[in-house]
Amino acid sequence: MTLIHMNILMAFSMSLMGLLMYRSHLMSALLCLEGMMLSLFVLAALTILSSHFTLANMMPIILLVFAACEAAIGLALLVMVSNTYGTDYVQNLNLLQC
């Protein structure tokens, strides 16, 4: 495993640890999810480039599309929760209150 792959896996694991530790605020959880998606994108792009697997060239682009959709839905949820409750606590996202 090369140093680049180790750094990408370290970035993914740091984002995952951030998501597990700082899960009280929705904004920090969204930032950690974006870090995870970015590291997955770079890992997928490097893996496809190094293996010369031409059939999977669209996989990083599709991953970016899903990351953009996740970011848009997350920001819409953040705005809705902030307008309703005044804070961005994840505790306010109880599905039984809807």
Curated annotation (Swiss-Prot):
Q: What is its EC number?
A: 7.1.1.2
Q: What does this protein do?
A: Core subunit of the mitochondrial membrane respiratory chain NADH dehydrogenase (Complex I) which catalyzes electron transfer from NADH through the respiratory chain, using ubiquinone as an electron acceptor. Part of the enzyme membrane arm which is embedded in the lipid bilayer and involved in proton translocation.
| Homology family | Belongs to the complex I subunit 4L family.
List, alphabetically, the PANTHER family matched.
NADH-UBIQUINONE OXIDOREDUCTASE CHAIN 4L (PTHR11434:SF0), NADH-UBIQUINONE OXIDOREDUCTASE SUBUNIT ND4L (PTHR11434)
Q: Which GO biological process annotations does it have?
A: ATP synthesis coupled electron transport
Give the main EC class.
translocase
- Subcellular location as annotated: Mitochondrion inner membrane
**What taxonomic lineage is listed for the species of origin?**
Eukaryota, Metazoa, Chordata, Craniata, Vertebrata
Subcellular location, principal: mitochondrion
Q: Which Pfam families match?
A: Oxidored_q2
Name of this chain's protein: NADH-ubiquinone oxidoreductase chain 4L
Name of the gene this protein is made from: MT-ND4L
